[in-house]
């Protein structure tokens, strides 16, 4: 699972989802990408599930880049606990994804293989996604 090795503060405020992605919104490494169309918190387990889905489909071919990292802790208080008595314990780590953020990049495979692998990964994520090609940086919407 993706988690930070060290953090300065164990508990943080909840991350904001306002606005659009102003960095990480272009394909930089691979030939194909998966771009978020909605804001969301994506957990380390969801990122791992998408990574496994892509790797299973492309098998030994291609190189995958994961361009998001879950660096924000989400805390949860136990069930049936009264208000107060401090902040809850960290439950899991999330990556803040804003619209336009390219989350995964893939190269070394054909367009058909990349499109299907990204479609499978999009089903594992809680956001609507778009498949991108480096040449056009446009794409089509994939419901998830």
UniProtKB/Swiss-Prot annotation:
The keyword Ribonucleoprotein applies. Residues 1-22 are annotated as: Disordered. Part of the 50S ribosomal subunit. Residues 1-14 have a biased composition (Basic residues). Keywords: Ribonucleoprotein, Ribosomal protein, RNA-binding, rRNA-binding, tRNA-binding. PANTHER family: 50S/60S RIBOSOMAL PROTEIN L16, LARGE RIBOSOMAL SUBUNIT PROTEIN UL16M. The lineage of its organism: Bacteria, Bacillati, Bacillota, Clostridia, Eubacteriales. SUPFAM superfamilies: Ribosomal protein L16p/L10e. This is Large ribosomal subunit protein uL16. It comes from the Bacteria. The keyword Acetylation does not apply. Binds 23S rRNA and is also seen to make contacts with the A and possibly P site tRNAs. GO terms for molecular function: rRNA binding; structural constituent of ribosome; tRNA binding. Belongs to the universal ribosomal protein uL16 family.
């Amino acid at each position: 699972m993706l988690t930070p090795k060290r953090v300065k503060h164990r508990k943080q405020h909840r991350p904001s989802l306002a606005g659009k992605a102003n960095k990480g919104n272009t394909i930089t490494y691979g030939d194909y990408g998966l771009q978020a169309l909605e804001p969301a918190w994506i957990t380390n387990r969801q990122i791992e599930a998408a990574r496994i889905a892509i790797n299973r489909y492309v098998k030994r071919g291609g190189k995958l880049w994961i361009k998001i990292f879950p660096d924000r802790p989400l805390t949860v208080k136990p069930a049936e606990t009264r208000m107060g008595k401090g902040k809850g314990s960290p439950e899991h780590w999330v990556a803040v994804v804003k619209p336009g953020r390219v989350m995964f990049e893939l190269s070394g495979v054909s367009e058909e293989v990349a499109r299907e692998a990204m479609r499978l990964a999009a089903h594992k994520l809680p956001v609507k996604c778009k498949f991108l090609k480096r040449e056009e940086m446009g794409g089509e919407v994939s419901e998830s």
